[in-house]
Structure formats: structure tokens, C-alpha cells
């Protein structure tokens, strides 16, 4: 998304139109595409890591793909015919459009693209023999080794705050499960739902609880806190943990409705000057679209 933003902005300026709506379309397009594979967005990979910590076999690279395709299709239709009409063009032009651009280094660009494609193919072909994080590190070493990026640039590119957050929340998620706190919260939710709740009802409640938390807490923390609870609920009602885990993964990635739901949302706010209420207008209906896809496809691809 960051790589595409200058191109989209330049196209809008050349066409004589404001770039804000186009940049918001780029944000939503990136979010829709992130649902298609396990590495499409960071929260998907985080969910897999938490599942491993909880002793559950993680999802495969394309396990999320049927749901992602459904969200892409319905989301694109919604945004094309309804969503983009709900908000105005702010007329703001981001700062990067006003600065001089460096000429493209074709060698570095070619190496970067080829390395990315190779890493993705290795992950997709043999996720058991080549874990995702190992393939990613090898790809990063190739980029640095071929001088596409210096060591200093690579270090600066790491979001250390995010690394610390994920590391600490991984411990909290495991502690939630091992200490029994996840089971206690799961029991409380089941008491609220009443005796013998249907898997559909449980899925619905978990989806909206995780999705709402995501809008204010960001997607990765939401998934890491909810997965132990969701898996405990699945165990207590005697169903497979996979439909519940997939529901939480998709709900956590549905970071549409507030600027705080994902880092790329905050980045887009800086580029467009859209407000909190603008994200709510366009994002809340998209949450319902995502729920429809989840509720429809979970019983088909991940039966309870």
C-alpha cells in the first residue's frame, strides 16, 4: 500500500482530481487483499503463531483464501457502488506528492520483486519445512546482501514498538490459556448466551466482540487476546476450534471502522485528513459485509 500511494496520488493529480478518495480506496483494497492469504496482513500470521503457542496445528497458507475471495468480491462491490459515495473528497494533497522523487533503481526493484515472489512461493509450497518467519528472514538477508537496502535502513524499517507489543501479548495469550483465565471468560460468555448455545450464535457473538475490540485496540492485540477465549469456548461446547479461530482471525483483520484499528489506517488519515466519523460511515457497513461472508462460508469450509 505504501509503495502504491505515490503512484495513485500522481495519477489523481495528472487527472485533475483530489487524491483523498483514491487513497482511501487504496487502503480498503489493500485490506481486502490481505484476507486472501495467510501473509496478506500481519494479524493473520499472528493468529497462526498464537494457535501454535496454544498447541493447535496452525492454518495452512491458503486456508483463509475462500473467505478472502468472498470478502474481496463483496467488499469491492460495496465500495464501488455505495461506500465511496458516503464520504467527501477532502481536497488534501499528501506531502510526499510535493517532494522530489528519486529515480527508480531497476536492479534493486527487480531483485526486491523476485525475492518477495520466491519467499511467498516457498511459504506456500512447504509451510511445514520452511516456517514463515524463517523464509521472511532469509528474504530480508538477501535484500541486505544484494545492497538493495543497507543494514541501517533495515534496522530503521523495523517497528520496534510493534515487535515489543506482539512479544508481550504472545506471553499474555499463552498465560490466558494456561492460567485458566481464558476458560473463566469463556464460561462467563457461555452463561450469558444461555444453555446449549448453537455454534452459529457463538460464532456471531465472537465475531462482533473481536471486531468491535479491533476498532479501538488495533487488530493484532485483539486477535491475541481473543483467540485463547474463543478456543476455550469451542472446547467447552464440544466443537472444532478451527471455525472459531478463523472467525476471530477474520474479525481481527476487519479493521475498517476507526483510524485506530490498524497502522495503515492512521497512515491514511495523514495522507487524506479524513476524520473518525468518515471511517465509521464507510467502515461499519463493511463490517456487516464481512460478517455475512464469515457466517455463510464458515459452515462450508470449516464445519463445526
For each feature predicted by the language model, list its residue ranges.
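Hydrophobic alpha-helical transmembrane segments of multi-pass integral membrane proteins
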Residues: 1-7, 195-233, 237, 241, ...
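Short helix-coil transition sites and intra-membrane helix breaks within transmembrane domains
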Residues: 1-3, 34-43, 128-132, 175-182, ...
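Hydrophobic transmembrane alpha-helices of multi-pass small-molecule transporters
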Residues: 63-187, 203, 286-287, 291, ...
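Alpha-helical transmembrane segments of multipass membrane proteins
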Residues: 11, 31, 50, 54, ...
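Cytoplasmic-side transmembrane-helix entry/capping segments in multi-pass membrane proteins
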Residues: 4-7, 21-28, 156-165, 222, ...
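Juxtamembrane and boundary regions of transmembrane helices in multi-pass small-molecule transporters
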Residues: 14-29, 33-98, 246-304
Amino acid at each position: 500500500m505504501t509503495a502504491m500511494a505515490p503512484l495513485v496520488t500522481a495519477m489523481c493529480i495528472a487527472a485533475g482530481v483530489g487524491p483523498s478518495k483514491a487513497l482511501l480506496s487504496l487502503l480498503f483494497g489493500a485490506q481486502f487483499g490481505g484476507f486472501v492469504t495467510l501473509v496478506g496482513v500481519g494479524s493473520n500470521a499472528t493468529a497462526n503463531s498464537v494457535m501454535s503457542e496454544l498447541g493447535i496445528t496452525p492454518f495452512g497458507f491458503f486456508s483463509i483464501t475462500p473467505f478472502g475471495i468472498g470478502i474481496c468480491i463483496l467488499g469491492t462491490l460495496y465500495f464501488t457502488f455505495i461506500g465511496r459515495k458516503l464520504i467527501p473528497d477532502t481536497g488534501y494533497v499528501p506531502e510526499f506528492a510535493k517532494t522530489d522523487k528519486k529515480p527508480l533503481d531497476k536492479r534493486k526493484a527487480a531483485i526486491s520483486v523476485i525475492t518477495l515472489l520466491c519467499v511467498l512461493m516457498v511459504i506456500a509450497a512447504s509451510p511445514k519445512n520452511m516456517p514463515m518467519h524463517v523464509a521472511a528472514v532469509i528474504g530480508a538477508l538477501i535484500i541486505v546482501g544484494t545492497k538493495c537496502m543497507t543494514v541501517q535502513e533495515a534496522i530503521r524499517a523495523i517497528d520496534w514498538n510493534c515487535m515489543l507489543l506482539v512479544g508481550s501479548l504472545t506471553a499474555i495469550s499463552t498465560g490466558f490459556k494456561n492460567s485458566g483465565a481464558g476458560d473463566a471468560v469463556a464460561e462467563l460468555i457461555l452463561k450469558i448466551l444461555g444453555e446449549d448455545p448453537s455454534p452459529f450464535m457463538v460464532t456471531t457473538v465472537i465475531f462482533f466482540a473481536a471486531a468491535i475490540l479491533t476498532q479501538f485496540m488495533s487488530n493484532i492485540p485483539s486477535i491475541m487476546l481473543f483467540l485463547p477465549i474463543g478456543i476455550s469456548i469451542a472446547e467447552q461446547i464440544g466443537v472444532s476450534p478451527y471455525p472459531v479461530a478463523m472467525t476471530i482471525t477474520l474479525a481481527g483483520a476487519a479493521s475498517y471502522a476507526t483510524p485506530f484499528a490498524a497502522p495503515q489506517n492512521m497512515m491514511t488519515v495523514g495522507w487524506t485528513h479524513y476524520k473518525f466519523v468518515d471511517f465509521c460511515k464507510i467502515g461499519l457497513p463493511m463490517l456487516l459485509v464481512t460478517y455475512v461472508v464469515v457466517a455463510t462460508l464458515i459452515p462450508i469450509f470449516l464445519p463445526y
